[in-house]
Amino acid sequence: QSVWHKPPQTVRCAFLYNRSPQDSGWSYWHELGRKALEDTFGSRVETVCCECVAQEDAQEVIERFIEDGYDVIFAASPVFLDACIRQCAIHPNAKILNCSLLASYHNVRSYYLRVYEAKFVLGAIAAALSESDEIGYIADYPIYGTPTSINAFALGAQMVNPRAQIVLEWSTLPGHSPEAALAARDVHIISSRDISAPHLESRAFGLYHEQDGVIANLAMPIWNWGKLYEGIVRSILTGAWSDEGEHNADRAMNYYMGMSTDAIDIICSQRLPARTRRLVDLLHERIRAGAFLPFVGPIVDQAGQVHVAADVALTPQEIILMDYLAGNVIGRIPSVDELNDVAKGLVSLQGIRAATKE
C-alpha cells in the first residue's frame, strides 16, 4: 500500500542554546544561522530560540516545543544529546536534531560542519607567516572533532614548512594560561577559538600574531550554520526529509557539510601578503571542488605509528573518530580529571578515548 507524504507549506523551527549568543561565540554562530533561515524563507519559516538551557533542563524544554507544535527542533550543543535521545524515544515521529559528531542513534539526526577544511588552510597560512618553526594552537575540549582540527592545522602547516611544529595548549585546564605558556616558548603565531563572544573585547581568536600584548588578526574560519539549516528545512518543505528517513531506515542520519556547500569558509586579513593570499584562494578552491583532500597519507602520529598509508584518503567516519595527534604536534591530550568543571561535563559525553580512558 502506497503512503503519500504531503510536504508542509510552512515549517516552525525551535532552537536550544546552552549559552547566550552574547556570551558564547558558539551560540552566536548558531543564532546567525537561525536568522539566515528567516531571511531565506520569509513567511514559510517561523523560528524561536531558548537560550541558556541547562543540560538537565533540556528534555523539558524539548517537550514544551513539541507540545507547542514545532515541526523541527535543533539542539545546538553536544550537551543536549542525551535529552534528544530520550525525547525521540517518547516521540519517535518528532524531528529532533543534535549538533554533535557522534549521534549514531536512528531517531536522532546529528549535524556538524567540516571546520577541519578551514583549519588546514589556516595551518598553511601560519607556516607561511611564522618566522620560526613553532606555531601555537590553543584547543578547548578533548572531544571528537578536536584532534581532527588540530591535525588538519598541523598538516597544513607541514605542507608549507616541513619543519613546522605545532605547540598545543589547552584552555580548559584550571590555573593554566595557554597564552603565557606559548609566550614562554617565544611562539607568536597562534590559532585559538574561532570567534570571540560579541560582548568580549579580546581579539585573540582565529589565527593571529601576538607580540608584547599586541594582537594582529590574520584569518579565521566562518561557521555558516545557515547553509546547513537551510538545507535541512528545505528538505522538510519539499518532502525529502521523509524520503531520506525511509531510505536510511536502518542507520543513523548525519549532516556533515563543509566548503563544498559554503557552510565553511575563511576570512583573511588584508595584512596577508599577496602570494600567501593566492595560496589560500588555491587551497580553498581545490578543497571546495573536492579536488584536494586534507587527510591523505602518509599520516604519522607522535609515536611514529603510521595511521594512514601513502596516497590513502581517510573516510568521513575515520576523520570524525580521529583520536591521536599528528607527529609534528608538541603536546598531549589531557584526561577528563585534569579539566575544569565545565569541560568535564561535555567530555564525559563526547570525549575521545585518550581523554576518558581510566
Regions found by a protein language model. Give the residues of each.
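A residue-level marker of the well-folded mature domains of exported/periplasmic proteins
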Residues: 2-358
